[in-house]
């Protein structure tokens, strides 16, 4: 393959797909979207071909099919990796298989100076192998260390121990750690300074995630919106909202329990890709199906519709307790006026005084819901204005993607 030296090839490994609700999936979608006409960068994106959170490109507009396992979207080459159902090891298998595919492609096509950007610290035991292999091919390894994968509630104690060790190994065998939170960058230096290759400190930089501040193109009487409201039995400013991956550390159990305990007459709309096992577990604990206000409304891939649903929510819940700068939170600050966040350092770092906070103890969120259910509209408007000002100053996707361009092509 003939290639011009000025084009920087960047291989993105770690996101399951593009345009779903996970942080990395949102990031990859936006990064490729903002750089789709950038002649200096060519992205190659690994996607899951099967299983939980897998890529379904039929739900995206503007896809050009190359083969059964490859397609082009936002001018990025997206390649699908089949993952056998091997339990918790799936995530490790996926990243290893994707990296092997990257190395094969780089070698076969004679790509000069590639960057392989790995998202999350899942493959520590293989980090040295791939670091050396990619360096031998003339490339560099960049890492997004995510936010404390070893703390996530869904993992058992042995698996959490593995993630912690894996994190240390991956930070050691990387050329640059791109942290999406100041707290994460600080943590890396506190834990891993003098533990890099030959006792060096890890090289880090901070680039947050972004949000789109433009209003939805849909009007309040748009048929798509009205049909969705009718189907889900919701109405404007009469529902609390959450959008995010359906995993325990995102506080779904607490949010549902506390909403059920509140006196609100509004609904609680949950936009997520439901995991039946976790859903069944929540039903056994909470019996939420008896509360007609609790509504699992499925997924929304139409970005304009999703934006309008956010704008029209009475309030937004954010229960993420693990991770850095979460895209779903920034999108909420940019589109929903009233945001109710679990009180952890990452969320405080992003939202500061533009949101209201609750803790995970029983009664905290229910009390806050009862309070804000009757809050003065002027107060809501004031919080919304402050939130949008904060996002426009620090977290626009243009600003974030411009920073990534500088890191990738410098």
Per-region residue spans from a language model:
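An aromatic- and histidine-rich active-site surface loop
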Residues: 90-102, 113-146, 324
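Conserved donor-binding/catalytic core segment of Leloir-type glycosyltransferases
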Residues: 10-13, 229-250, 256-263, 269
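Glycosyltransferase donor-sugar binding loop
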Residues: 47-52, 211-212, 243, 267-282, ...
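A short, active-site helix/loop in glycosyltransferases that binds the activated sugar's phosphate group
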Residues: 172-203, 211-216, 404
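N-terminal strand-loop element at the rim of the active site
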Residues: 5-7, 12-21, 34-88, 184-191, ...
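Conserved acidic donor-binding segment of nucleotide-sugar-dependent glycosyltransferases
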Residues: 355-363, 371-377
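Membrane-proximal helix-turn-helix segments that form the acceptor-binding/catalytic region
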Residues: 159-177
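Acidic donor-binding loop of glycosyltransferase active sites
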Residues: 308-324, 337-338
